[in-house]
Amino acid sequence: MDLAFGDEKTKTFITNVGLVTTNGPYGYNIMACEWTHHISYSPGLVAICLQSECATLANIRESKEFGISIAAKEQSILSSVVGNNSAKTVDKIKVAKALGFTFTKAKKIDVYMVSQSALHIECKVFK
């Protein structure tokens, strides 16, 4: 996947919160990741910074994939809710749906993507 330089969708990625979605031992999960970084246009590379004990990292280690939905302005409440709770104790997808937020299945990986986000990115871990 390439990220086009100067493209309007690529520009939205510069400062917005990444809503990272995963599936693994903690089930389908979402978290707000303020440290979501665009690394390269071609190939399209993204880095996220996670705490070693978080459920999101455990899911990614198992599945080797994750989604990033770059939050739109209207999703600030969602960012706050999913960023301040752990999937180890709260079903954040269920809470988000109860708040009226909707999800779609990713096209190439087994995660949900947040509907109406500024940008969707389906990621696979490589190393």
What are these regions (language model features)?
Residues 1-127:
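Active-site-proximal mixed secondary-structure blocks
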